[in-house]
């Protein structure tokens, strides 16, 4: 959702750019990369400090991989062979440390709060064991389709099922990402959930089409700055129309994650999909969803939940974002009620962005009665359907798992059962 997977508690990193290089002795022992965990309550943020020499100067930059932030320039206050002090002035942050037993033993400070922070040499290895590796036992086809109404050409990957036979017509699923422009793999923090889903479904006899969002990757054209969910829905509608035009498939369905779940129900109400998989899709009006999201994240982060619908609307009105203004006014109830095709709606009970108790409950109540519908809540899964501890977005990049194997199996089994 429009936490955009970037609504992280501002302990450290707003994307700022400060100039600041230190002219130092080029033999300093602290050159290189240092990393560690900043722990605040139940939260833990990975920080990486880079000290790189160039032309007699040392450039100091910070990364916060768990927040998707890299290359943030820091100002050097002091640097020697055994100690340093760096500052990011615009957010009131400093880090002072001394070399001790091969580690930087120091203190992180921001706006009056001080926290011990130990950094060790090197950058932590990012492990993503579920990311599929070639060779694949199935065919991938690069395709494009066109949304004429918005002059957008969408580029994507059509993945055929393993052992595909032209005499058969397998089910096919269009994969639609959440909010914010993303590539066809819905990539974030090194995770590629849509690639993992496409690979798994191909091995279970199901085809998929995943595509780069408009003006992202190889997709070109289409308004982005002033676009709303309704505009992105037309991109997905063009994808469904393209799949039907191939005349190679049986059921043509749509799997939407987060905002993509809203798009799935919008198209379901228009009877353009044969089935829907809603991964953490909204079930309530946008302003209610985002207020609940904000309050839960504040509470889990140790702050008092103080957001109200009125306060949220006042804050967002100042930003004048067409996307957010459309979203906070959008109530999915009518689209969900008018969706007649089979629906599999799922959420994790640790989802902090689209809260299961609020949204999945609403979807269950609004769906038309059908034995083919399935509504399921998974224990200990977050918004990305990873097994997690708190569910906070700051955990997404720290977790090696991309998506729960149980979720993958349930999606494939449910789609395949529709043929019976």
Task: List the model feature ranges, each with a label.
Residues 168-179:
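Short beta-strand element of the alpha/beta-hydrolase
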Residues 124-168:
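N-terminal cap/lid segment of alpha/beta-hydrolase-fold proteins
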Residues 266-267, 271-338, 353, 369:
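Accessory cap/linker subdomain of secreted extracellular hydrolases
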Residues 24-100, 105-113, 130, 138, ...:
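Central antiparallel beta-sheet cores of small beta-barrel/beta-sandwich binding domains
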Residues 341, 352-366:
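Short alpha-helix in the alpha/beta-hydrolase fold that links the catalytic acid
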Residues 193, 225-246:
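Alpha/beta-hydrolase active-site loop
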Residues 339, 345-347:
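Short beta-strand/loop motif that positions the catalytic acidic residue
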Residues 187-209:
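Short amphipathic alpha-helix adjacent to the substrate-entry channel of hydrolases
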């Amino acid at each position: 959702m429009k936490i955009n997977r970037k609504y992280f508690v501002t302990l450290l990193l707003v994307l700022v750019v400060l100039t600041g290089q230190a002219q130092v002795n080029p033999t300093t022992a602290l050159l290189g990369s240092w990393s560690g965990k900043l722990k605040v309550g139940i939260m833990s943020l990975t920080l990486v400090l880079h000290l790189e020499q160039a032309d007699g100067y040392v450039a100091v930059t910070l990364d916060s991989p768990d927040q998707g932030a890299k290359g943030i320039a820091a100002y050097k206050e002091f640097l020697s062979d055994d100690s340093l002090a760096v500052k990011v002035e615009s957010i009131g942050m400093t880090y002072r440390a001394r070399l001790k037993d091969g580690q930087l033993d120091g203190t992180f400070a921001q706006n009056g709060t001080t926290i011990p922070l130990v950094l060790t040499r090197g950058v932590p290895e990012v492990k993503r064991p579920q990311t599929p590796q070639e060779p694949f036992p199935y065919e991938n086809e690069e395709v494009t389709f066109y949304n004429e109404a918005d002059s957008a050409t969408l580029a994507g990957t059509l993945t055929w099922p393993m052992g595909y036979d032209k005499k058969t017509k397998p089910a096919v699923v269009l994969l639609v990402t959440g909010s914010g422009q993303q590539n066809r793999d819905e990539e974030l923090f090194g995770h590629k959930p849509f690639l993992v889903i496409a690979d798994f479904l191909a091995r279970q006899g199901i085809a998929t089409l995943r595509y780069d969002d408009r003006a992202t990757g190889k997709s070109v054209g289409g308004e982005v700055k002033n676009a709303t969910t309704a505009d992105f829905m037309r991109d997905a509608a063009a994808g469904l129309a393209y799949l039907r035009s191939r005349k190679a498939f049986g059921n043509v369905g749509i799997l939407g994650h987060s905002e993509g779940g809203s798009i799935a129900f919008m198209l379901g109400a228009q009877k353009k999909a044969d089935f829907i998989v809603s991964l953490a899709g909204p079930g309530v009006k946008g302003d209610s969803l985002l207020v609940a999201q904000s309050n839960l994240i504040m509470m889990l982060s140790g702050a008092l939940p103080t957001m109200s619908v009125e306060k949220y609307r006042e804050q967002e009105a100042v930003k004048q974002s067409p996307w957010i203004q459309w979203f906070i006014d959008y109530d999915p109830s009518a689209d969900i009620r008018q969706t007649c095709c089979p629906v599999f709606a799922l959420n994790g009970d640790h989802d902090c962005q689209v809260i299961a108790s609020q949204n999945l409950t609403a979807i269950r109540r609004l769906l038309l009665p059908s034995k083919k519908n399935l509504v399921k809540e998974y224990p200990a899964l977050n918004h990305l359907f990873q097994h997690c501890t708190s569910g906070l977005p700051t955990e997404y990049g720290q977790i090696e798992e991309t998506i729960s194997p149980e979720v993958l199996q349930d999606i494939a089994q449910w789609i395949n059962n529709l043929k019976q």
